[in-house]
Protein backbone atom coordinates (compact mmCIF):
# COMPACT_ATOMS: atom_id res chain seq x y z
CA UNK A 1 0.00 0.00 0.00
CA UNK A 2 1.04 3.60 -0.46
CA UNK A 3 -0.53 6.52 1.34
CA UNK A 4 0.21 9.84 3.01
CA UNK A 5 -0.98 10.84 6.47
CA UNK A 6 -0.90 14.29 8.07
CA UNK A 7 -2.45 15.72 11.22
CA UNK A 8 -2.98 19.11 12.78
CA UNK A 9 -4.38 20.34 16.07
CA UNK A 10 -5.05 23.58 17.90
CA UNK A 11 -6.36 24.22 21.38
CA UNK A 12 -8.59 27.06 20.16
CA UNK A 13 -10.32 28.85 23.01
CA UNK A 14 -10.35 25.90 25.39
CA UNK A 15 -8.32 25.61 28.57
CA UNK A 16 -7.57 21.88 28.32
CA UNK A 17 -6.63 19.34 25.72
CA UNK A 18 -8.83 16.24 26.00
CA UNK A 19 -8.41 14.81 22.49
CA UNK A 20 -6.16 12.08 21.21
CA UNK A 21 -5.25 11.24 17.62
CA UNK A 22 -3.25 8.28 16.41
CA UNK A 23 -2.39 5.98 13.58
CA UNK A 24 -0.36 2.88 12.90
CA UNK A 25 0.25 0.74 9.84
CA UNK A 26 1.79 -2.35 8.29
CA UNK A 27 2.80 -2.94 4.69
CA UNK A 28 -0.77 -4.05 3.93
CA UNK A 29 -3.07 -2.03 6.19
CA UNK A 30 -3.38 1.29 8.01
CA UNK A 31 -5.45 2.41 11.00
CA UNK A 32 -6.46 6.01 11.79
CA UNK A 33 -8.25 6.86 15.03
CA UNK A 34 -9.44 10.06 16.73
CA UNK A 35 -11.18 10.42 20.08
CA UNK A 36 -12.79 13.49 21.67
CA UNK A 37 -12.73 13.39 25.46
CA UNK A 38 -16.00 14.91 26.64
CA UNK A 39 -15.32 17.96 28.75
CA UNK A 40 -18.59 17.74 30.67
CA UNK A 41 -17.29 14.63 32.42
CA UNK A 42 -14.19 14.11 34.58
CA UNK A 43 -11.06 12.64 33.01
CA UNK A 44 -12.17 13.13 29.43
CA UNK A 45 -8.54 13.14 28.38
CA UNK A 46 -8.07 9.75 30.04
CA UNK A 47 -11.09 8.34 28.23
CA UNK A 48 -9.81 9.56 24.87
CA UNK A 49 -6.33 8.24 25.59
CA UNK A 50 -7.69 4.82 26.54
CA UNK A 51 -9.81 4.68 23.38
CA UNK A 52 -6.96 5.51 21.02
CA UNK A 53 -4.50 3.22 22.77
CA UNK A 54 -6.98 0.35 22.70
CA UNK A 55 -7.45 0.68 18.94
CA UNK A 56 -3.74 1.05 18.23
CA UNK A 57 -2.70 -1.85 20.44
CA UNK A 58 -5.41 -4.11 19.01
CA UNK A 59 -4.32 -3.29 15.47
CA UNK A 60 -0.66 -3.95 16.25
CA UNK A 61 -1.60 -7.33 17.70
CA UNK A 62 -3.93 -8.41 14.91
CA UNK A 63 -2.65 -6.88 11.66
CA UNK A 64 -0.01 -9.49 10.75
CA UNK A 65 0.37 -7.98 8.23
CA UNK A 66 -3.35 -7.33 7.70
CA UNK A 67 -6.58 -7.83 9.60
CA UNK A 68 -8.65 -10.96 9.10
CA UNK A 69 -11.84 -8.85 8.98
CA UNK A 70 -11.62 -5.03 9.31
CA UNK A 71 -15.29 -4.61 10.22
CA UNK A 72 -15.17 -7.28 12.91
CA UNK A 73 -11.97 -5.72 14.23
CA UNK A 74 -13.57 -2.28 14.55
CA UNK A 75 -16.75 -3.61 16.15
CA UNK A 76 -14.90 -5.69 18.72
CA UNK A 77 -12.39 -2.96 19.52
CA UNK A 78 -14.94 -0.20 20.13
CA UNK A 79 -16.56 -2.43 22.75
CA UNK A 80 -13.18 -3.21 24.30
CA UNK A 81 -12.32 0.49 24.42
CA UNK A 82 -15.58 1.44 26.09
CA UNK A 83 -15.21 -1.33 28.67
CA UNK A 84 -11.62 -0.28 29.34
CA UNK A 85 -12.87 3.22 30.18
CA UNK A 86 -15.50 1.77 32.52
CA UNK A 87 -12.82 -0.37 34.17
CA UNK A 88 -10.64 2.73 34.61
CA UNK A 89 -13.51 4.55 36.32
CA UNK A 90 -14.15 1.66 38.68
CA UNK A 91 -10.45 1.17 39.46
CA UNK A 92 -10.11 4.86 40.35
CA UNK A 93 -13.40 4.99 42.27
CA UNK A 94 -14.94 7.60 39.98
CA UNK A 95 -18.57 8.33 40.79
CA UNK A 96 -19.03 9.63 37.23
CA UNK A 97 -17.49 7.84 34.28
CA UNK A 98 -15.16 9.56 31.81
CA UNK A 99 -16.68 9.74 28.33
CA UNK A 100 -15.34 10.07 24.81
CA UNK A 101 -16.41 9.91 21.21
CA UNK A 102 -14.38 7.93 18.70
CA UNK A 103 -13.98 7.55 14.96
CA UNK A 104 -11.65 4.91 13.50
CA UNK A 105 -10.85 3.90 9.94
CA UNK A 106 -9.02 0.95 8.42
CA UNK A 107 -7.73 0.93 4.84
CA UNK A 108 -6.83 -2.54 3.61
CA UNK A 109 -6.86 -4.21 0.18
CA UNK A 110 -7.76 -0.84 -1.33
CA UNK A 111 -10.96 -0.60 0.71
CA UNK A 112 -12.04 1.77 3.47
CA UNK A 113 -13.96 0.52 6.50
CA UNK A 114 -14.81 2.96 9.29
CA UNK A 115 -16.69 3.05 12.58
CA UNK A 116 -17.79 5.95 14.74
CA UNK A 117 -19.64 6.56 17.97
CA UNK A 118 -20.62 10.10 18.88
CA UNK A 119 -19.94 13.20 16.79
CA UNK A 120 -16.34 12.78 15.70
CA UNK A 121 -16.64 12.52 11.94
CA UNK A 122 -15.11 10.88 8.90
CA UNK A 123 -15.23 12.64 5.54
CA UNK A 124 -14.44 10.80 2.30
CA UNK A 125 -13.75 13.05 -0.67
CA UNK A 126 -12.88 12.49 -4.32
CA UNK A 127 -11.74 15.20 -6.75
CA UNK A 128 -12.83 17.93 -4.37
CA UNK A 129 -16.34 16.57 -3.85
CA UNK A 130 -17.82 14.82 -0.85
CA UNK A 131 -18.51 11.12 -1.43
CA UNK A 132 -19.76 10.39 2.09
CA UNK A 133 -19.53 11.41 5.70
CA UNK A 134 -20.60 9.80 8.94
CA UNK A 135 -23.78 10.91 10.69
CA UNK A 136 -23.51 12.08 14.29
CA UNK A 137 -25.25 10.21 17.07
CA UNK A 138 -27.26 13.28 18.00
CA UNK A 139 -30.90 14.29 17.91
CA UNK A 140 -30.06 16.71 15.11
CA UNK A 141 -28.30 14.27 12.78
CA UNK A 142 -30.48 11.19 13.42
CA UNK A 143 -34.01 12.54 13.99
CA UNK A 144 -35.57 9.46 12.39
CA UNK A 145 -34.91 7.50 15.58
CA UNK A 146 -37.35 9.63 17.58
CA UNK A 147 -41.01 10.42 17.26
CA UNK A 148 -40.32 13.56 19.29
CA UNK A 149 -37.14 15.08 20.64
CA UNK A 150 -36.85 15.08 24.46
CA UNK A 151 -37.81 18.56 25.60
CA UNK A 152 -35.00 18.86 28.16
CA UNK A 153 -32.10 18.16 25.82
CA UNK A 154 -30.57 20.26 23.06
CA UNK A 155 -30.88 18.79 19.59
CA UNK A 156 -27.07 18.49 19.44
CA UNK A 157 -26.62 16.45 22.60
CA UNK A 158 -25.13 13.04 21.87
CA UNK A 159 -27.14 9.97 22.72
CA UNK A 160 -24.17 7.62 22.82
CA UNK A 161 -20.46 7.65 23.56
CA UNK A 162 -17.76 5.41 25.01
CA UNK A 163 -17.49 5.04 28.78
CA UNK A 164 -21.07 4.30 29.77
CA UNK A 165 -22.11 1.12 31.54
CA UNK A 166 -24.42 0.66 28.55
CA UNK A 167 -22.52 -0.59 25.47
CA UNK A 168 -22.03 2.21 22.95
CA UNK A 169 -24.06 2.50 19.79
CA UNK A 170 -22.06 2.84 16.60
CA UNK A 171 -22.33 2.92 12.82
CA UNK A 172 -20.06 1.24 10.28
CA UNK A 173 -19.26 2.69 6.87
CA UNK A 174 -18.03 0.33 4.17
CA UNK A 175 -16.12 -1.53 3.07
CA UNK A 176 -15.95 0.77 0.05
CA UNK A 177 -13.32 0.79 -2.70
CA UNK A 178 -10.94 3.75 -2.75
CA UNK A 179 -9.60 5.28 -5.95
CA UNK A 180 -6.19 6.80 -6.54
CA UNK A 181 -6.18 10.29 -5.03
CA UNK A 182 -9.13 9.80 -2.68
CA UNK A 183 -8.75 11.63 0.61
CA UNK A 184 -10.17 10.60 3.98
CA UNK A 185 -10.39 12.98 6.94
CA UNK A 186 -11.16 12.20 10.58
CA UNK A 187 -11.97 15.28 12.65
CA UNK A 188 -13.46 16.65 15.84
CA UNK A 189 -16.49 18.92 15.93
CA UNK A 190 -14.20 21.89 16.35
CA UNK A 191 -13.57 21.60 12.61
CA UNK A 192 -16.88 20.60 11.09
CA UNK A 193 -19.03 22.89 13.24
CA UNK A 194 -17.64 26.03 11.58
CA UNK A 195 -17.89 25.02 7.91
CA UNK A 196 -20.36 23.13 5.77
CA UNK A 197 -19.67 19.72 4.27
CA UNK A 198 -19.04 20.91 0.73
CA UNK A 199 -16.56 23.59 1.84
CA UNK A 200 -14.74 21.06 3.97
CA UNK A 201 -14.49 18.55 1.11
CA UNK A 202 -13.33 21.25 -1.29
CA UNK A 203 -10.74 22.39 1.24
CA UNK A 204 -9.17 18.95 1.15
CA UNK A 205 -8.15 19.46 -2.49
CA UNK A 206 -6.20 21.87 -4.66
CA UNK A 207 -3.04 21.68 -2.55
CA UNK A 208 -0.89 18.87 -1.12
CA UNK A 209 -2.53 17.00 1.75
CA UNK A 210 -0.15 18.49 4.33
CA UNK A 211 -1.15 22.00 3.28
CA UNK A 212 -4.85 21.12 3.12
CA UNK A 213 -4.83 19.77 6.67
CA UNK A 214 -2.96 22.83 7.97
CA UNK A 215 -5.23 25.27 6.14
CA UNK A 216 -8.42 23.61 7.34
CA UNK A 217 -7.16 23.73 10.91
CA UNK A 218 -6.20 27.39 10.65
CA UNK A 219 -9.54 28.31 9.08
CA UNK A 220 -11.50 26.55 11.82
CA UNK A 221 -9.50 28.24 14.57
CA UNK A 222 -9.94 31.63 12.93
CA UNK A 223 -13.68 31.17 12.55
CA UNK A 224 -14.00 29.88 16.10
CA UNK A 225 -12.42 33.00 17.54
CA UNK A 226 -11.43 33.59 21.15
CA UNK A 227 -14.05 31.26 22.53
CA UNK A 228 -13.95 28.71 19.75
CA UNK A 229 -13.72 24.98 20.12
CA UNK A 230 -10.54 22.99 19.89
CA UNK A 231 -9.72 21.59 16.47
CA UNK A 232 -8.14 18.25 15.65
CA UNK A 233 -7.95 16.32 12.41
CA UNK A 234 -5.99 13.62 10.64
CA UNK A 235 -6.09 13.08 6.90
CA UNK A 236 -5.06 10.28 4.56
CA UNK A 237 -4.49 10.34 0.80
CA UNK A 238 -4.74 6.99 -0.95
CA UNK A 239 -2.34 6.15 -3.76
CA UNK A 240 -3.21 3.02 -5.70
CA UNK A 241 0.29 1.80 -6.46
CA UNK A 242 2.75 -0.43 -4.64
CA UNK A 243 5.37 0.94 -2.33
CA UNK A 244 6.02 2.03 1.20
CA UNK A 245 3.72 4.42 3.04
CA UNK A 246 4.76 8.04 3.17
CA UNK A 247 3.73 9.52 6.49
CA UNK A 248 4.22 12.36 8.90
CA UNK A 249 5.02 10.47 12.09
CA UNK A 250 2.93 11.31 15.12
CA UNK A 251 4.58 11.38 18.51
CA UNK A 252 5.18 9.59 20.75
CA UNK A 253 5.08 6.39 18.72
CA UNK A 254 1.54 6.25 17.33
CA UNK A 255 -0.09 8.85 19.56
CA UNK A 256 -0.31 12.59 19.35
CA UNK A 257 -2.07 15.01 21.65
CA UNK A 258 -4.55 17.03 19.67
CA UNK A 259 -7.15 19.61 20.61
CA UNK A 260 -10.02 19.23 23.02
CA UNK A 261 -13.51 18.79 21.66
CA UNK A 262 -16.22 20.49 23.72
CA UNK A 263 -18.78 18.45 25.56
CA UNK A 264 -22.31 18.43 24.13
CA UNK A 265 -24.28 21.24 25.72
CA UNK A 266 -27.74 20.95 27.27
CA UNK A 267 -30.60 23.05 26.00
CA UNK A 268 -30.35 26.80 26.46
CA UNK A 269 -31.32 27.74 29.98
CA UNK A 270 -30.93 24.23 31.35
CA UNK A 271 -28.14 23.95 33.93
CA UNK A 272 -25.45 21.58 32.77
CA UNK A 273 -25.66 19.64 36.02
CA UNK A 274 -29.15 18.47 35.10
CA UNK A 275 -27.72 16.38 32.24
CA UNK A 276 -26.29 13.76 34.58
CA UNK A 277 -25.25 10.13 34.15
CA UNK A 278 -28.76 8.90 34.95
CA UNK A 279 -30.25 11.01 32.17
CA UNK A 280 -27.61 9.84 29.73
CA UNK A 281 -28.33 6.21 30.62
CA UNK A 282 -32.07 6.79 30.18
CA UNK A 283 -31.45 8.38 26.81
CA UNK A 284 -29.31 5.47 25.64
CA UNK A 285 -32.00 3.05 26.77
CA UNK A 286 -34.55 5.06 24.78
CA UNK A 287 -32.36 4.85 21.68
CA UNK A 288 -32.00 1.11 22.07
CA UNK A 289 -35.79 0.79 22.28
CA UNK A 290 -36.22 2.93 19.16
CA UNK A 291 -33.70 0.84 17.27
CA UNK A 292 -35.43 -2.39 18.24
CA UNK A 293 -38.76 -0.98 17.02
CA UNK A 294 -37.28 0.04 13.66
CA UNK A 295 -34.88 -2.85 13.16
CA UNK A 296 -36.77 -4.17 10.14
CA UNK A 297 -36.80 -0.81 8.37
CA UNK A 298 -34.16 0.06 5.79
CA UNK A 299 -31.96 2.88 7.13
CA UNK A 300 -30.90 5.83 4.95
CA UNK A 301 -27.72 5.01 3.04
CA UNK A 302 -24.54 6.66 4.22
CA UNK A 303 -22.54 5.89 1.12
CA UNK A 304 -23.46 5.16 -2.48
CA UNK A 305 -21.62 1.83 -2.52
CA UNK A 306 -22.57 -1.08 -0.28
CA UNK A 307 -23.79 0.93 2.72
CA UNK A 308 -23.77 -1.09 5.92
CA UNK A 309 -24.76 0.00 9.41
CA UNK A 310 -24.71 -1.69 12.76
CA UNK A 311 -26.46 -0.64 15.93
CA UNK A 312 -25.90 -2.77 19.01
CA UNK A 313 -28.80 -3.25 21.33
Explain the meaning of each model-derived region.
Residues 1-313:
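PP2C/PPM-type serine/threonine phosphatase catalytic domain
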Amino acid sequence: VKFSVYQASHIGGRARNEDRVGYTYTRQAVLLVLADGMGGHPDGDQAADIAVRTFVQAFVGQAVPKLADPRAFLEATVMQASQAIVDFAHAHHRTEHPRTTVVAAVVQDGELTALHSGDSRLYWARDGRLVARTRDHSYHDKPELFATRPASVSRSVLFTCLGSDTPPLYDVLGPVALRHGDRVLLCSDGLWAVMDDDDLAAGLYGVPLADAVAQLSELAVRRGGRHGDNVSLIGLEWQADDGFPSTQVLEPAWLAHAAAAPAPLPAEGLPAAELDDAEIERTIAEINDAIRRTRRQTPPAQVPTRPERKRPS
